[in-house]
Structures are given as structure tokens and as C-alpha cells.
């Protein structure tokens, strides 16, 4: 039995659908918290209230459903975490700790917990960032992701708990909008282009960040989950790379489809400083060698597919 926390979120909402298609709707519990689940998801299979900061609730859900695998998708993202340090600490650090403990106590067999490019910081080599390198993030979100990686590796080594994770870049998708991240501009730009032919970007035009299209993010999460345990040297800290671009490059690519699209810039100092502390591209040799990671989408194919799907969703 599988539990997905954060099932109403950007990644969780698509992951639940994919897992239910593969393993049967009745075998995948959609874990919800504040945001209600989409009606179709609620109707299609089991769901439960899961607030990871509430150990009792987490324990009850895992026991009641006999959960053996958890995909932990709920997290307070970078920009919101900077504005709500307490909540970020509660959810991203205490919540993750609860999950490790409760999983151990209930014989959960596998825990997938994504990390992020935020686990790097201003002292990390910025281009082609190695998998194993300096990790001194200067954001609370980044610190919580380093905590998650290190604790995950600790539980794996000390208790043989099968914890796995990848460092996700900005994820671009058309089904559910991301909230409160720094890379969200890349999704919002498509909404702006389709709705009003314009978008005001909060990052500078030349801010280069790693990005990935949702089908590749889902594939990475599922592929790491089914990778042969014995072939893994890393566990909770895999770089995965698909593409890197700047707001101005993305705008130009969107203009190829919609020539009326106009971009303007009004910089948000908070999100700009977060973006400036992150890598612009990643070396993902470890993921490619240890479990065969390979993305399918590059920037052009992402933009074409995203524009087409979002346009038909919005019109
Ligand atoms: C964010 O912008 O906070 C996230 C991330 C890169 O982890 N999308």
C-alpha cells in the first residue's frame, strides 16, 4: 500500500494519478492537509488527512492502511519558507523527522523524499555542480533539504531503512500550479502568455536555473523508487538534470509560438537572492550511472507541449 503526502500539490497531484494507474487506485492513499484534493482524485481512491507535523495522525494513517511505501511530496517551498521560518521548520524539519521515525516503527519498506537544488548554496560550484560538493545553503528551505538528505542517509545506513531522494530543479507543469517557490515564474510565464500576452517576471532576465518538465520529474521519482537497491551508492542526494534556461530565453521560446507575447521585469529581491544562491546546471552522472536517469524533454519540446496543454486547459 502506498501513501503520497502533499497529494494536492503540484507534483503530488500528478504522482497520485500515475501511481494509481500503475498499481491500482485502491492501493494508493492520497494524503491531504489544508488544500482539498481535486474531486476526481478524492473519488477515485482512498484518501486521508496527513499532517506530518502531527506524529499521531501520521502513525494512525500508516497503521490503518498498512502503508509500505511513502512518497513524501509535502513541503514548504523556498520563498514561503523564508517568510515563515517557524512553519518551514515545523513542516520541513520536524515533519520529516516524524516521517523517518514513524516509518521505522511501522516497518515501512521504502520512503521517497525529494530534495532540491536548494540544498546547494552560494559557495557551491555554480555550473555543472558536482553531485558531492559544498552544501552550505543560506535559505531555511535549503537547510531543511540538507537535513532531509543527511537524515535520510543516516536512517538508511544505521537502520537499513530504504530512503531515496533526488534533488529536483524547478518543475514545470500545466495541471496544478506551483505555489511559493522561486522557480514558479517559469510556469506563471505560460499562464501570462496564454491569458494576456504578457508577463511581469520577478527574476532578472539573465538568471539561469535548472528546470525540468513534469513528465520527467514523475519519471525520475518512479525510476529512483524502483532502482535496484544494491546498485545505489548514493541514496537521498542525487542530482538530476534536464535543462537550464533564463527568463529571457524562456520568453523568446514562448514568442516563437505566440509572437504577441511581451515580457517585462520587476525584480523581487527575496526571490532574486534565493535564485542567485542556486546552481545554474548540475552534473547528474551519479543518477545516470546508478539507476539509469535520462530525461526525455529539452527546452523546445517542453515549451511546445506545455503551451499546447495549458492553452487547451484554459480555453
Ligand atoms: C522552489 O523554487 O522553491 C522549488 C525548488 C527548486 O525546490 N521549485
Regions found by a protein language model. Give the residues of each.
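N-terminal Rossmann NAD(P)H-binding glycine-rich loop of SDR-like oxidoreductase domains
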Residues: 1-22
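NAD(P)H-binding glycine-rich loop region in Rossmannoid oxidoreductase-like domains
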Residues: 52-91
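Conserved Rossmann-fold NAD(P)-dependent oxidoreductase catalytic core, especially the SDR/UDP-sugar
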Residues: 97-140
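Conserved beta-loop-beta element that borders a ligand/cofactor-binding pocket
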Residues: 115-116, 149-175
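Flexible, glycine-rich beta-alpha linker
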Residues: 121, 136-139, 164-183
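Glycine/proline-rich active-site loop of Rossmann-fold NAD(P)-dependent oxidoreductases
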Residues: 146, 159, 173-187, 214-215, ...
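A conserved pocket-lining segment of Rossmann-fold NAD(P)-dependent short-chain dehydrogenase/reductase
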Residues: 168-178, 188-212, 216
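C-terminal substrate-binding subdomain of Rossmann-fold SDR/epimerase-dehydratase oxidoreductases
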Residues: 202-204, 210-315
